[in-house]
Structures are given as structure tokens and as C-alpha cells.
């Protein structure tokens, strides 16, 4: 499966200087969806969660776009779970960890 966007790392954090990991912010997702307005997109999610505020913004952006298919590909918890609820479809690979 080819994913157009992967939501990973901590939600609401662009870059975690402590761990050196990149996260995903609402601005990043909105920018991607704006560039792909009117197109059907496949978005993968593997995130421990994070900011509720950013998660809600991402949820709304995905819902407003209307053509997002979400794929849970790894651990998806907390804020990363409810942002998927705005999608056209939500799919899980074999043995994902949703919490």
C-alpha cells in the first residue's frame, strides 16, 4: 500500500529535541490536505498520541476534506485514535495496537 501521508510521532510536536523524533502537527496535516484538495488520499497513522487540541484540529481537517482513507499501521493511541474518526474509511493492518 502506498500512503500519501504518514501521521507519526507525537501529535502536536513538529520535532522533539529530546528524542530526536519528528512528530505531526495540525499545520502539517492541513497543508498536505490543502495541496490535495478534491483528491482521494491515503493516510497512515502510527502515533502514541499527544496534544488533544492538535488532534481535534487534525480530525476536523480530515473530516472537512472528505476524501481521506485512514490506515492504522502501528501503535495508535490517545489523540491519534480520535483524529481517525473524521475519515471516509478507517482500516487496520494485521495486529495493530490501538489504545
Regions found by a protein language model. Name each.
Residues 1-99:
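Terminal-region recognition feature
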Amino acid at each position: 500500500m502506498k500512503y500519501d501521508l504518514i501521521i507519526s510521532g507525537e501529535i502536536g510536536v513538529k520535532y522533539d529535541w529530546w528524542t530526536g523524533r519528528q512528530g505531526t502537527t495540525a499545520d502539517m496535516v492541513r497543508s498536505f490536505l490543502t495541496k490535495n484538495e478534491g483528491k482521494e488520499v491515503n493516510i497512515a497513522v502510527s502515533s502514541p498520541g499527544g496534544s488533544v487540541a492538535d488532534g481535534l484540529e487534525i480530525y476536523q481537517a480530515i473530516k472537512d476534506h472528505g476524501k481521506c482513507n485512514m490506515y492504522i499501521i502501528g501503535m495508535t493511541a490517545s489523540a491519534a485514535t480520535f483524529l481517525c474518526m473524521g475519515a471516509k474509511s478507517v482500516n487496520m493492518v494485521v495486529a495493530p495496537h490501538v489504545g
